[in-house]
From Swiss-Prot:
Pfam families: Aminotran_1_2 (PF00155). Its cofactor is pyridoxal 5'-phosphate. GO terms for molecular function: histidinol-phosphate transaminase activity; pyridoxal phosphate binding. The gene is hisC2. This is Histidinol-phosphate aminotransferase 2. InterPro entries: Aminotrans_II_pyridoxalP_BS (IPR001917), Aminotransferase_I/II_large (IPR004839), HisP_aminotrans (IPR005861), HistidinolP_aminotransfase (IPR050106), PyrdxlP-dep_Trfase (IPR015424), PyrdxlP-dep_Trfase_major (IPR015421), PyrdxlP-dep_Trfase_small (IPR015422). GO terms for biological process: L-histidine biosynthetic process.
Length: 369
């Protein structure tokens, strides 16, 4: 029998499959309990559920499931271009923002080239990089966040892409406008900067720099965003990139046909118009973050301040057994040892009662540790 792993290209041989947050149904089967009794705070999902306007748009689209979607996503691109004050030709749609990251890697990376990203950064950066045979350069973090100066120093003549996230997942750390401006000014023009803003909608006012403000001055900048988080459409898989027309043209040369389905296109268009839902999502996230921080303080735990819809808490011990014990309590969070954070758990912000259930379970587990 052929060794099909050995036949794969070397970069793929070194990869391990991405491990997502544990599904509710899987834990329910393992414990033999009703899925409704389980609290999942593992995947940075919106606890409000989808926007009512998005659900209405999905229902209206169901009669057309026999048809292929608009392969160019004309209406969603138009709405995004209007919202973001760019030309529609600067918008690339993806099957989630993960798809955008993969498109970048396939278009710009190859064996002999490299991509730079931070330690403790999103796992898809190295996966996408190694999958095409390129070298991934993980730069040591500073205070759990991006060390932008060190990342600049890691760039060489074979660097084609730099991945930066603001805020970063799973740490929740962020950098300000001055730091971003200095960084962009020093990145060589032939290196594409991918600014991952998956959680930007949770920022209020000028808490975080808006990547769109830098597009016109930096043609090597691509801003990646998603409808999976604040817009509550994670299962539909729809994300997008905003970039120069030249970069968008390149990405569309490798983009799969019909990569965003009709339901996702319709729901995303409607979600963009549901301003009340987005405002409610922000308010819930702010109050939930405060609730968890207060709970961690009461338990004597430290955490990393976060601008996302999640928070990383330091248990000051191997977090693996605590994670397993929480599962037995019917609570799913995210261990992040694979991100070089073995004493941390990442906890998504949930509804008040979900946050309370988690804190009670955590207190119980720690008391018996």
């Amino acid at each position: 029998m052929s060794d099909f792993l050995a036949l794969a290209q070397p970069g793929v041989q070194k990869l391990s499959p991405y491990v997502p947050g544990k599904p509710v149904d899987e834990l329910a089967r393992e414990l033999g309990i009703d899925p409704a009794a389980i609290v999942k705070l593992a995947s940075n999902e919106n606890p409000l559920g989808a926007s009512p306007k998005a659900l209405e748009a999905i229902r209206a689209e169901l009669a057309e499931l026999t048809r292929y979607p608009d392969g160019n996503g004309f209406e969603l691109k138009r709405k995004l271009a209007e919202r973001c004050a760019v030309d529609a030709a600067q918008v690339t749609l993806g099957n989630g923002s993960n798809d955008i990251l993969d498109l970048v890697a396939r278009a710009y990376l190859a064996p002999g080239l490299n991509a730079v990203f931070s330690e403790h950064a999103f796992a898809v950066y190295p996966i996408a990089t190694q999958a095409v045979g390129a070298e991934g350069r993980a730069v040591k973090a500073r205070a759990w966040g991006h060390d932008l100066e060190a990342m600049l120093a890691a760039i060489d003549g074979q660097t084609r892409v730099v991945f930066v996230a603001n805020p970063n997942n799973p740490t929740g750390t962020w950098f300000g406008a001055d730091a971003l401006e200095r960084f962009l000014a020093q990145v060589p023009a032939e290196v594409l900067v991918v600014l991952d803003e998956a959680y930007i909608e949770y920022a209020e006012g000028d808490e975080l720099p808006d990547g769109l403000d830098y597009l016109a001055r930096h043609p090597n900048l691509l801003v990646s965003r998603t409808f999976s988080k604040a817009y509550g459409l994670a299962s539909l898989r729809v994300g997008y990139a905003l970039s120069s027309k030249a970069v968008a043209d390149v990405l569309n040369r490798v983009r799969q046909p019909f990569n965003v389905n009709s339901l996702a296109l319709a729901a995303a268009c409607a979600a963009l118009d549901d301003h009340d839902y987005l405002a409610q999502s922000r308010r819930l996230n702010d109050s939930g973050m405060a609730q968890l921080e207060d709970g961690f303080h009461a338990l004597g735990l430290s955490w990393i301040p976060s601008k996302g819809n999640f928070i990383a808490v330091d248990l000051a011990r191997d977090a693996g057994p605590v994670y397993q014990a929480l599962l037995r309590e019917g609570v799913i969070v995210r261990p992040v040892a694979g991100y070089g954070m073995p004493t941390f758990l990442r906890v998504s912000i949930g509804l008040p009662e979900e946050n309370d259930r988690f804190l009670q379970a955590l207190g119980k587990v720690l008391a018996h540790d």
